[in-house]
Regions:
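Mid-domain alpha/beta scaffold segments of enzyme catalytic cores
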Residues: 1-266
């Protein structure tokens, strides 16, 4: 069995002392590939460094909505240049986050549209971030949709209406450890049967959102723990683990246009 953590931040400084061990832990948990996701120019550079060093790691470049207050065309030009690296497989994460407004809404919307255009020009799938945008995110991607684009709505925790909107746009749905949480994950669990199996990918969003089975043991999430989310998904869907793992793997490499031979299974 092989699992793919479709969204992690092991480029975060909290892994600087034990990153190699974290990647070893992932392999022991059958997590044989991971997408290291950027949120800033600096984190994009680190993601590419990690992808260069570890064959099972891939990278994205992009600016998170929290960080667009410092975005500029110069920053995006640098990211565009880096996007041509062979291990860069996606643009993101980008989107809208109105939860705590670390960047003004006007700036978020401006740089979101700009990054959509860049990803389209580069023909890269998009890793979307949406939180508490009250319908504005869907409104924007529906109005700016020049072509069918590949993308994933990472860490989905929205309502059924939003889920339908994303599926109608042919986006994949990223499922995190929220699925395992007793109260917080209750509504998400109720929506799982509405997501076609070919549209699901799993993720940790580490170091955040530690799944329930690990939450009382460790503070920091890591790619190995995507296995807990996977097993909960198997339980909800009543799927055989080998069967579901194979489908989720295919979904993820299709999304990021990764060839099987690009992933070294050790």
């Amino acid at each position: 069995m092989k699992l793919f953590d479709s969204h992690c931040h092991i480029n975060d400084k909290s892994y600087d002392r034990d990153r190699k061990a974290v990647i070893e832990n992932a392999k022991k948990a059958d997590v044989h590939a991971m997408m290291v996701v950027a949120i800033t120019e600096q984190s994009a550079n680190k993601a590419i460094e990690i992808a260069n060093e570890y064959s099972q790691c891939f990278a994205s470049v992009g600016i998170h909505p929290h960080d667009v207050k410092t975005c500029s065309e110069n920053v995006l030009s640098t990211l565009i240049e880096w996007s041509h690296h062979p291990k860069v497989k996606a643009w993101g994460e980008t989107g809208l986050d109105f939860n705590r407004m670390f960047s003004p809404q006007k700036s978020q919307e401006k740089w979101f549209i700009r990054q959509l255009k860049i990803a389209e020009d580069l023909n890269l799938p998009i890793i979307f971030h949406e939180r508490d945008s009250k319908g504005r995110f869907l409104e924007m991607i529906r109005s700016y949709d020049p072509n069918e684009r590949k993308g994933v709505v990472h860490c989905f925790s929205g309502i059924k209406k939003e889920l339908k909107g994303y599926l109608d746009l042919n986006y994949d749905i990223g499922i995190t450890g929220i699925l395992t949480m007793h109260k917080r994950g209750e509504y998400l669990r109720s929506l799982i049967d509405y997501i076609p199996i070919e549209r699901i990918v799993i993720e940790t969003d580490s170091p955040y959102l530690t799944p329930a089975p690990e939450k009382n043991k460790v503070r920091r999430n890591e790619p190995a723990f995507v296995r807990s989310t996977f097993l909960k998904l198997c339980d909800i869907r009543e799927d055989d683990p080998e069967y579901l793992a194979a489908i989720l793997w295919k979904n993820t490499i299709r999304l990021f246009e990764i060839l099987e031979e690009e992933v070294t299974i050790i």
